Amino acid sequence: MAKRDFYEILGLGKNASDEEIKKAYRKLAMKHHPDRNPDSKGAEDKFKEAKEAYEMLSDPQKRDAYDRYGHAGVDPNMGGGGGGGGFADAFGDIFGDIFGQAGGGRGGRGGPQVYRGADLRYNLEITLEQAAHGYDTTIRVPSWDSCETCDGSGAKPGTSPINCTTCGGHGQVRMQQGFFSVLQTCPKCHGSGKINPSPCTACSGAGKIKRNKTLEVKIPSGIDDGMRIRSSGNGEPGMNGGPPGDLYVEIRIKQHAMFQREGDDLHCEIPISFAKAALGGEIEVPTLNGKASFTIPEGTQSGKTFRLRSKGIKGVRSGYAGDLFCHVVVETPVTLTEKQKELLREFELLTIEGGSKHSPQTKSWKDKVKEFFE
């Protein structure tokens, strides 16, 4: 049975910090500890599973190997002295050697594998105004930097890495799997061809340290929710001289207090008074670029929509501005004075006398009700 992903076990993403990993493990350990669940075999299995995931992800060197090669990078039973993988694994390694290893690995049969660095993702939340007009900002991204103590060698200062004793410095081992003789990434040096008998204490032999990197991001005007901006070369560093991965900044737009966005169009509700709806007149409305106005006709009903062309958002791809749709909401007056109530009662009587002339929808509705009960 295939082993579960260590990050999935802890309920975390691959960008999780060391503190988040420790916190998630403690929570699961408390929940599934055998002493708290003496009669549950399932709880014991989950406890062991969480413990293994924590042991791997809390160690920088093991975590780096797992991030790059999956379980094969941290399982001593997968590779090394023969045996191991099944028929599908054999073919996977054959085709990997011909076309390049998964994840961007490449290299000759006699040398260490070269791997492209992993891509990173960063979620950035911005306002609707920033999305409409464009926005320049800086972000801090968790990333790996070369260890300053050992200059990236992974070896304790004053010592040097030596050729891996398992692969002889080639970064690969040849394994016999049935009728096939195949090359696999060395499980001891993880393809680097080197090992550190005296690892650097600052980076635990990884040659790199995780820290926040500050980057400038230019967000183009008109960008929409869910779009991504690629920052080439700002992902994780490659291995054995491989190129770095890319950083993808995924945009999330905050909900606006007034406008709702649909593509490049904007929608908003415009409350107007009962008198304004009846008499008509000019309405002033806000837009993302200042104020605008339009005229509503006499007798405007609640729910009527007015379209203001090119008052929406200029599309990041099309270059054309969308429209602003204003949905009128006729507001019923509240907290009236006696004088106002008196005038409204008089108005109501005049309206009744006028019949369908003043309230055609009310007359129509009353006729339908009458027919319904007859």
Curated annotation (Swiss-Prot):
A zinc finger (CR-type) spans 134-212. CDD domains: DnaJ (cd06257), DnaJ_C (cd10747), DnaJ_zf (cd10719). InterPro entries: DnaJ, DnaJ_C, DnaJ_domain, DnaJ_domain_CS, HSP40/DnaJ_pept-bd, HSP_DnaJ_Cys-rich_dom, HSP_DnaJ_Cys-rich_dom_sf, J_dom_sf. GO terms for molecular function: ATP binding; heat shock protein binding; unfolded protein binding; zinc ion binding. PROSITE patterns: DNAJ_1 (PS00636), DNAJ_2 (PS50076), ZF_CR (PS51188). Pfam families: DnaJ, DnaJ_C, DnaJ_CXXCXGXG. CXXCXGXG motif repeats lie at residues 147-154, 164-171, 186-193, 200-207. The keyword Transmembrane helix does not apply. One of its GO terms (cellular component) is cytoplasm. Its cofactor is Zn(2+). Zn(2+) 1 binds at residues 147, 150, 200, 203. Participates actively in the response to hyperosmotic and heat shock by preventing the aggregation of stress-denatured proteins and by disaggregating proteins, also in an autonomous, DnaK-independent fashion. Unfolded proteins bind initially to DnaJ; upon interaction with the DnaJ-bound protein, DnaK hydrolyzes its bound ATP, resulting in the formation of a stable complex. GrpE releases ADP from DnaK; ATP binding to DnaK triggers the release of the substrate protein, thus completing the reaction cycle. The J domain is necessary and sufficient to stimulate DnaK ATPase activity. Zinc center 1 plays an important role in the autonomous, DnaK-independent chaperone activity of DnaJ. Zinc center 2 is essential for interaction with DnaK and for DnaJ activity. This is Chaperone protein DnaJ. It comes from Herminiimonas arsenicoxydans. The lineage of its organism: Bacteria, Pseudomonadati, Pseudomonadota, Betaproteobacteria, Burkholderiales.
